[in-house]
């Protein structure tokens, strides 16, 4: 929602794979369906992988270089590969207007991050605007399930779900998850997607430049 995650993840993945292949030779990575199948296989072996995506990433690397021996060498390569990936994963470019909007809103509201990912917002200059950040690892679950939202209540005093606003770009993980709990929502729709859910479409915006004005008009 704050930056375009897709090119960031893609570049991190490609750079990490190239580094691994420089170390061990060509690796059969497979396509996205192969990734999903391997993910399901790993979850059957360790249910926590469903919400611990850092562990998921490491275990995928480990599976892909399972032919490397001894095991301690394989583990070293996996750990170093993950460090490369996670560092690259934090090389982001914020959407226009994000920092200005957060600076304005943080002076009037308590702001928090709820993410299914493993980016650490406090590594970015915008981290100073957020009172809390909850990942899937900390929630031990993933949106649209309610664990993230329940945990958010621990960081705010005397606030209930009907006094919250959740802003997100994913129709299910962000909007449906909040809607089911009676949390107000705003949909960040910068790609002009069609609304495809069977519950009412929330207010939407496509530019962070106008978000403060939308919130002021909505609540003040």
Q: What do the predicted segments below correspond to?
A:
Residues 24, 69, 108-109, 182:
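Glycine-centered loop/turn motif at secondary-structure junctions
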Residues 1-96:
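N-terminal helical cap/lid subdomain that shapes the substrate entry/recognition surface
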Residues 6-7, 99, 103, 110-220:
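Asp-based, Mg2+/Mn2+-dependent phosphohydrolase catalytic module
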Residues 91, 108-111:
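A general structural signal for well-ordered secondary-structure junctions
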């Amino acid at each position: 929602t704050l930056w375009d995650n897709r090119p960031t993840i893609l570049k991190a993945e490609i750079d990490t794979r190239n580094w691994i292949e420089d170390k061990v030779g060509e690796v059969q990575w497979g396509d996205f369906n192969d990734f999903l199948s391997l993910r399901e296989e790993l979850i059957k072996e360790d249910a926590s992988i469903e919400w611990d995506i850092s562990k998921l990433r490491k275990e995928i690397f480990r599976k892909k270089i399972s032919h490397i021996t001894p095991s301690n060498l394989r583990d070293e390569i996996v750990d170093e590969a993950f460090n490369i990936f996670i560092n690259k994963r934090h090389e982001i470019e914020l959407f226009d207007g994000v920092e200005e909007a957060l600076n304005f809103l943080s002076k009037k509201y308590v702001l928090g991050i709820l993410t299914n990912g493993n980016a650490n917002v406090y590594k970015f200059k915008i981290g100073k605007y957020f009172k809390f950040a909850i990942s899937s690892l900390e929630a031990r679950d993933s949106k649209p399930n309610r664990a993230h939202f329940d945990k958010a209540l621990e960081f705010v005093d005397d606030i209930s779900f009907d006094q919250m606003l959740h802003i997100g770009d994913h129709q299910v993980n962000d909007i449906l998850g909040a809607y089911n709990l009676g949390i107000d929502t705003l949909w960040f729709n910068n790609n002009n997607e069609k609304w495809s859910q069977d519950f009412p479409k929330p207010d939407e915006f496509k530019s962070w430049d106008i978000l403060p004005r939308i919130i002021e008009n909505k609540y003040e």
